[in-house]
Amino acid sequence: MTNTRKATQVAVVIPTYKARNHILAVINGIGPEVARIYVVDDCCPDGSGDFVAANCKDIRVTVIKHTENQGVGGAVMTGYQAAIVDGAEVLVKIDSDGQMDPTLIKDFVTPIVNGESDYTKGNRFFDLEKVQSMPNVRIFGNAVLSLMCKFSSGYWNIFDPTNGFTAIHAEVASRLPFKKISRRYFFETDMLFRLNILRAVVMDIPMDANYGDEVSNLRISKIIGEFLVKHGLRLVKWCKFVGSLKRRLYRR
C-alpha cells in the first residue's frame, strides 16, 4: 500500500480525560512541524476541554467535546475525522497525561512522509536496560499482550501493542471502519487488526520505556482475560476473511 508521498499537513489528536494538570504542558511541547492540534474532551468530569479553551493561547488548538464518554478509541476517532475534514495528511495521536514526549513526533511522522510506512507506533522495549526498570508483572503482561496481538493482527514484527503513541497517514485512516473499531482500551490493538486487512505497512518507533502512562488508564493484569477473548474473536474474523478471499479466487 505504501507509496512515496509528501505530507504537508500534520495534525495531532489528544484524547483527554482527567488530565487537566498535564494537558497544557503537552500542548506546549508540540513543535512547529504540527499544523493543527485537536483536543478531544471525552466528557471529562474535570472539564479538561473548557480548561484548555480558557487557558491555551496556541492558535493551532481546536477543542472538541463529547456529551457522552466514548472511551479513548471514540475520542481518537472523533479527532481523526475532524483532522481529515480539515485536510491533514498525517494524524498523530498522543496522550494527555504527559508520559509521551512530544519532541518525538518527528520520528513518528518521518517514515510516513518518506513513504516507508502507513502507520507508526511507539515501542518501549527496544532498550533492554531501560526495560529492566519495569516491574516484572508489567513486562510479563506486555509480552502476553504482544503475543496475542501478533496472532490476531498478523503483524509479527511489532511489539508493545497497547502503546498509544501513534501516527497514521490520513489516506489510510479514511479507509478504516470507524464505527467498528473498539472504543475502549482494546482500541490500539484493534487498529492493528483493521490495518492488516488493508495491508497497511506498520513500523515500530523506539521510545523511552515510561510505563507510568498505563497506571492511570489500565492495569494489564486486569485486562489480559478480556483482551484474550477479543483477540480470539479477531483471529476468527481474520480466518473467515482469508477463507472468503480464497473462495473468491478459486471461483475465478
Residue ranges and their predicted role:
Residues 1-7, 179-252:
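Hydrophobic helical membrane-anchoring modules
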Residues 9-11, 36, 190:
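Cell-envelope/extracellular polymer assembly enzymes that use nucleotide-activated donors
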Residues 11-15, 38, 65:
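Short hydrophobic beta-strand elements that form part
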Residues 17-32:
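Short, well-formed alpha-helical segments that are part of the catalytic scaffolds
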Residues 21-25, 46-55:
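Acidic helix N-cap motif at the loop->helix transition within catalytic regions
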Residues 41-50, 68, 98:
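A conserved acidic beta->alpha catalytic loop
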Residues 66-85, 102-185, 212-222, 226:
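Acceptor/aglycone-binding surface of glycosyltransferases and processive sugar-polymer synthases
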Residues 88-99:
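Short beta-strand-to-loop acidic/aromatic patch adjacent to the donor-nucleotide binding site
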